[in-house]
Amino acid sequence: MKANELREKSVEELNAELLNLLREQFNLRMQAASGQLQQTHLLKQVRRNVARVKTLLTQKAGA
């Protein structure tokens, strides 16, 4: 997910995206804990996407 794509979204859309990412992160962590996760790079990608969305939400709140 690109930062430019996220900047075009509204606050409501960013909150929805954040919720989806957190759910995905939870599912990936459960798969990793049970040894079922084959693509471990997804954990890092989702974590960074969560950070991107949170950063944009903070920036939009301050503007």
Curated annotation (Swiss-Prot):
Pfam families registered for this protein in UniProt: Ribosomal_L29
Protein name: Large ribosomal subunit protein uL29
Listed PROSITE patterns: RIBOSOMAL_L29
Family of the protein in this entry: Belongs to the universal ribosomal protein uL29 family.
One of the record's GO molecular function terms: structural constituent of ribosome
Ribosomal protein keyword on record: yes
Keywords: Ribonucleoprotein, Ribosomal protein
GO CC, one annotated term: cytosolic large ribosomal subunit
Signal peptide: none
GO biological process: translation
